[in-house]
Regions:
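Conserved short secondary-structure transition element at the edge of the structured enzyme core
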Residues: 32, 65-76, 120-125
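Conserved, charged catalytic cores of large soluble enzymes
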Residues: 117, 124-139
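Short coil/turn segments at secondary-structure boundaries
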Residues: 84-85, 130-136, 171-174
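Intrinsically disordered or highly flexible coil/loop and linker segments, enriched in small
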Residues: 78, 125-132, 165-169
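Mobile "lid/hinge" segments at catalytic clefts and subdomain interfaces of large enzymes
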Residues: 73-82, 86-89
Length: 479
């Protein structure tokens, strides 16, 4: 899929005078040069229909919708993404006429034939059409077989990354069922993003990990959630507050072998303070100046004192480039700040009991708030792998995963990195001296050093190697 973005240089100026990503022939030729020969789809809204001021039209504002369609096919598009809301089949048919008038019917037909071929091949390769009637019992026997379950378990084990282990876990198999304290974690439910808008969400208390799954491996001690005592929500029922919990006492925790805290990685999105509410609901903006909140990869509030100013990106529809810099602005505490508070309580009450954090992540995060409070840290991607974490604690499986993102030393380190250069960030270093860099991970023997880490230790790319973008642009400009 192509993009909406305008190609810009490091100062935010249009790069090469070319069309936006949706129409940029150099972006498409990148795929051609590396041997890609399959379906190419555009992002939504790049031909019109979502308003003439949408970002997808950059560089083609003066063209009609059929002219944009023709240009898209000419540049390499196979599918017009989300086209149902645009000018309909009439605009597409007229787009073909524009294309045929420009390059001739024979070449225009070849382009559309290739687009249809790529689409049909991809759809047929899914295998959904040759036999639409399947035996569900037979399918279940394959999907839920012992072999499939074993494969899934092995894959989950391999995906978990251990980034800290202060000698707590040795891989020695446990012969008895340990006792573990698992605290509940609080989330405000707040979210904000450009597509869905601002949502205050529904506050909740949930166990950090699946207690039913953990019960197969441990004797579990946990907290008690009381009745919700907050203000009424849209459904008329009271919302949960941070006070609607009774934590396990020091006496209850004292007999535990481990404290296990399940957490979601810290992340607050950047958004415009005048962003409308989710699903079109009204939002009172009285007294709110318009500005951008900083993104944040830490749980606590973050003031972006070292952020870029002016911003690289910014709306240019009105002729002048908008400055979206959030320098000096403050990101609120993460909606999951209560996850950090659960860890803080666990660390305070644990005494000599080892504290293990199991963190589910979708990106990097700043570890200064978390790492000093833990004896062991496991990282899972996208979702908690409760079974895998439990097996590793019990010595039934060995962690073998590697970090797929650099983990920043600080928010300032994030601001200091170059936006389009990979692996150029100052990474977090923990109390043991280990640096949470790309491809870092630990097993029972210590820091992993194998063929994978040697391969991934190559110097990061600082220029495109498979396609010399700059020379192509110079040639095009000269012509």
């Amino acid at each position: 899929m192509t993009e909406y973005a305008i190609n810009v240089d490091k100062d935010g100026n249009p790069f090469g005078g070319e069309y936006a990503g949706a129409y940029n022939e150099f972006m498409y030729s990148l795929l051609d040069e590396v041997g890609y020969d399959s379906l190419k789809i555009t992002d939504w809204g790049v031909f019109g229909g979502l308003g003439e001021k949408t970002g997808g039209l950059w560089g083609t504002e003066s063209l009609s919708e059929p002219e944009r369609v023709a240009l898209g096919f000419e540049r390499g598009v196979n599918i017009l993404g989300g086209y149902g809301g645009y000018g309909g089949i009439g605009a597409i048919a007229e787009g073909y006429n524009v294309l045929a008038g420009r390059i001739g019917e024979e070449e225009a037909n070849a382009i559309l034939t290739k687009a249809a071929y790529n689409y049909i091949v991809v759809m047929m390769n899914l295998g959904m059409f040759e036999q639409p009637y399947n035996d569900s019992a037979y399918a279940d026997s394959i999907i839920f077989s012992q072999d499939a379950n074993a494969f899934g378990q092995e894959t989950q084990d391999k995906s978990v990354v251990m980034i800290k282990n202060d000698g707590v876990l040795t891989g020695e198999a446990k012969t008895e069922k340990p006792k573990v304290y698992v605290p509940y974690v609080y989330s405000t439910g707040f979210s904000a993003n450009w597509m869905m808008g601002v949502s205050e969400g529904t506050p909740s208390w949930t166990p950090g990990l699946d207690l039913d799954v953990l019960g197969k491996y441990f004797d579990v001690v946990t907290d008690t959630v009381g009745a919700a005592t907050g203000e009424a929500g849209a459904d008329g029922n009271p919302k949960f507050t941070k006070d609607d919990i009774t934590r396990a006492t020091a006496e209850e925790i004292a007999g535990c072998d481990y404290v296990l805290v399940g957490m979601t990685g810290a992340y607050s999105a950047s958004y415009n303070s005048h962003l409308q509410a989710a699903f079109g609901a009204p939002r009172d903006l009285t007294g709110i100046d318009e500005f951008y909140y900083p993104p944040s990869l830490q749980y606590a509030e973050y003031t972006a004192d070292t952020a870029r100013d002016p911003s690289i990106s910014g709306n240019t529809v009105d002729g002048a480039k908008e400055n979206r810099s959030y320098k000096g602005k403050t990101a609120p505490a993460d909606a999951n700040y209560g996850h950090l508070e659960a860890l803080q309580y666990a660390n305070e009450i644990a005494g000599d009991i080892p504290v293990i954090a199991a963190v589910s992540m979708e990106r990097g995060m700043v570890w200064t708030e978390v790492e000093p409070l833990c004896d062991v840290i496991f990282v899972s991607y996208n979702a908690q792998k409760t079974d895998a974490i439990a097996r590793m604690i019990l010595g039934q499986a060995e962690p073998n995963g590697l970090l797929v993102f650099q983990q920043p030393a600080s928010m300032e380190a994030i601001d200091a990195q170059v936006d389009d250069v990979p692996r150029d960030m100052e990474c977090y270093k923990d109390a043991a001296g280990n640096t949470y860099d790309f491809a870092f991970g630990m097993n029972w023997s210590g820091v992993i050093d194998d063929a994978r880490t040697q391969k991934y230790s190559a110097a990061p790319l600082t220029k495109v190697q498979s396609h010399d973008f700059g020379d192509k642009l110079k040639t095009a400009a000269a012509e």
